């Protein structure tokens, strides 16, 4: 996957967080959400990444310089939507003209390297111009629905407000993460129109352009439905932390770590444990700590 690249959208203010810091730096298990995304992209084997910064850009750029110095940044001065954000990285894209690009929001901490790899394999084997990562959920309200044609290819992504009663019953939703052939994406970006109440340029409309021009568009349905999850306020951030906390504790207990009561136990997913370790209530372990037997 050496020839691949990725773009992380991280320009948004996240007003409901009521923070003076970029939303993507809000932490899930002691690690900024964008760092979870970067770690998964790196584990998947993607070596060249560009982060689109915007709100409080200097704070995010300083964090990236210290923690991921190889990551490139481009600033979106006017925040006019996700497709507009991607267009800010046009020079980055042109350097990867004959490659594929993975595009994702920086506030989706549960994206995992397995989903990235498998969606790329599907993207290549199906010879797609664009591949949407989708997930099937019990409550799809608020998400764009994946509408497929009789050949099971993506026919449209329909937003909640535009969905008919029959489309609203569809449980397969758009995660907001995509693979694109770079050359095709560069051609599509200027054709996206701000045909919405916000007068903004949205990346899902690139899918509409691709479909209208006869390019192959498909969706890779992940079994990890948590990849869709993000946080727009501190209540949702708390929910993400609890999901992540429970996953870590479950994996530790299945690996032999004794946690007789999980009350107040918060452990970083980078921590490691020796054999026969017992963790008592109220224990907090941060970072890549190593607890020996």
Please describe what each predicted stretch is:
Residues 1-5, 32-104, 110-114, 121:
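Conserved N-terminal catalytic core of the sugar/cofactor nucleotidyltransferase
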Residues 1-19:
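N-terminal nucleotide-binding beta1-loop-alpha1 segment
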Residues 9, 28, 104:
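Catalytic metal- and UDP-sugar-binding loop of GT-A-like glycosyltransferases, i.e.
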Residues 16, 109-110:
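A short, conserved beta-strand element in the Rossmann-like catalytic core
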Residues 27, 110, 179, 230-231:
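Short aromatic/basic micro-patch
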Residues 46, 98, 127-130, 215:
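Short, high-confidence coil segments that cap the C-terminus of an alpha-helix
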Residues 111-197:
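Conserved core of the sugar-phosphate nucleotidyltransferase
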Residues 198-293:
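Left-handed beta-helix
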């Amino acid at each position: 996957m050496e020839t691949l690249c990725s773009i992380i959208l991280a320009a948004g203010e996240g007003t409901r967080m009521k923070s003076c810091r970029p939303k993507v730096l809000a932490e899930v298990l002691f690690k900024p959400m964008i760092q979870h995304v970067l770690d998964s992209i790196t584990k998947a084997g993607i070596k060249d990444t560009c982060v689109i910064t915007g709100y409080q850009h200097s704070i995010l750029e300083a964090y990236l310089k210290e923690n991921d110095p190889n990551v490139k940044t481009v600033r979106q001065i006017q925040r006019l939507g996700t497709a507009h954000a991607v267009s800010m990285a046009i020079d980055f894209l042109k350097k990867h003209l004959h490659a594929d690009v993975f595009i994702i929001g920086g506030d989706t901490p549960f994206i995992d390297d397995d989903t990235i790899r498998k969606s790329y394999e599907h993207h290549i084997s199906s010879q797609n111009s664009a591949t949407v990562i989708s997930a099937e959920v019990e409550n799809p309200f608020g998400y764009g629905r994946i509408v497929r044609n009789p050949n099971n290819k993506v026919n449209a992504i329909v937003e909640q407000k535009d969905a008919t009663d029959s489309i609203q019953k569809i449980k397969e939703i758009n995660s907001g993460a995509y693979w694109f052939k770079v050359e095709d994406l560069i051609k599509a970006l200027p054709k996206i129109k701000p045909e919405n109440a916000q007068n903004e340029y949205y990346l899902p409309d690139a899918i509409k352009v691709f479909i209208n021009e006869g390019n192959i568009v498909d969706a890779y349905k992940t079994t990890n439905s948590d990849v869709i999850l993000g946080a727009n306020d501190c209540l949702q951030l708390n929910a993400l932390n609890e999901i992540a906390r429970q996953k870590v504790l479950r994996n530790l207990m299945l690996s032999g770590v004794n946690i007789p009561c999980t009350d107040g136990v918060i452990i970083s997913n980078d921590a490691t444990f020796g054999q026969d370790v017992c963790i008592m209530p109220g224990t907090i372990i941060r970072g890549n700590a190593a607890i020996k037997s």
